[in-house]
């Protein structure tokens, strides 16, 4: 409960300082889950915002057929499952969760997601 109060107060201070035109720079903050959504509501106001959290795929894995064979099992014409994993990770576009939860962000980063 205290963490929620502290997070809300720090976000409110961040917003008040930035809206007042002050030149004071507050450090960026990590905002995740409900805190991130609340921050977007406060920053974007009536304009609204674009936020689509990724769906958890673990429950869906039970519906997929199990792989049989493969390069490890002697499939000569099959490519290793994770051969291009590094290249694919570099191509993933950073979303608001990556920008504000995994890394700290500021109010200007949040404003980029307003409609």
UniProtKB/Swiss-Prot annotation:
GO cellular component, as recorded: extracellular space
The family this protein is said to belong to: Belongs to the insulin family.
Species for this entry: Verasper moseri (Barfin flounder)
Oligomeric and partner information: Heterodimer of a B chain and an A chain linked by two disulfide bonds.
Gene: ins
Membrane-crossing segments per the record: none
Disulfide-bonded cysteines: 32-101, 44-114, 100-105
Example GO molecular function: hormone activity
Name recorded for this polypeptide: Insulin
């Amino acid at each position: 409960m205290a963490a929620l109060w502290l997070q809300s107060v720090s976000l409110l201070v961040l917003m008040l300082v930035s809206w007042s035109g002050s030149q004071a720079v507050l450090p960026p903050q990590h905002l995740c889950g409900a805190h991130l959504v609340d921050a977007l509501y406060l920053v974007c106001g009536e304009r609204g915002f674009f936020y689509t959290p990724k769906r958890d795929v673990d429950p869906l894995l039970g519906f997929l057929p199990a792989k049989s064979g493969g390069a490890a099992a002697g499939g000569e014409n099959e490519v290793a499952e994770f051969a291009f994993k590094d290249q694919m990770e570099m191509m993933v576009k950073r979303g608001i969760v990556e920008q504000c939860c995994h890394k700290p962000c500021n109010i200007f980063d949040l404003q980029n997601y307003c409609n």
